[in-house]
């Protein structure tokens, strides 16, 4: 709802806004296949397909996107590679990718597919949350990947 985006932007300023975009892949007859923004606990598809044009439009209201790949979120079973590529190819403002990271290979793939434009959030895969990825090693890996920029 662009009217509400305008209101919040005027109230707090674009420089204080991060838009949270929950994205789910949709492929069904009569619809263009792609990642769509979903609402209501990730159950309802909107008509908004994630495209460079949509990201351009929404970036008028914020300084960063937090993008949830909801089909893989919380599963620690791999990232949504096509979504990471789409976001990285666009890369005009900071984007934090969330969803599916479960290995150091995923971090490397996000850096490559995301053209080094993506930040990452890791949840259940971290050892501090019961996962297998040691927190300190993740910090080091991300630092090493950033040095390659």
Residue ranges with predicted function:
Residues 5-11, 108-149:
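C-terminal helical cap(s) of enzyme catalytic domains, especially alpha/beta-barrels
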Residues 19, 65, 87, 110, ...:
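Conserved, mostly hydrophobic/aromatic
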Residues 1-8, 82-120:
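Catalytic cores of alpha/beta
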Residues 18-22, 68, 96-99, 121-123:
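A cross-family glycoside hydrolase active-site/sugar-binding cleft signature
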Residues 1-73:
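Conserved anion-binding
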Residues 76-77, 130:
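RNA substrate-recognition surfaces in RNA-acting enzymes
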Residues 47-52, 77-86, 135-139:
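Charged helix-capping and loop-helix junction motifs
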Residues 71-73, 101-104, 127:
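Short Gly/Pro-enriched loop/turn and capping motifs at secondary-structure junctions
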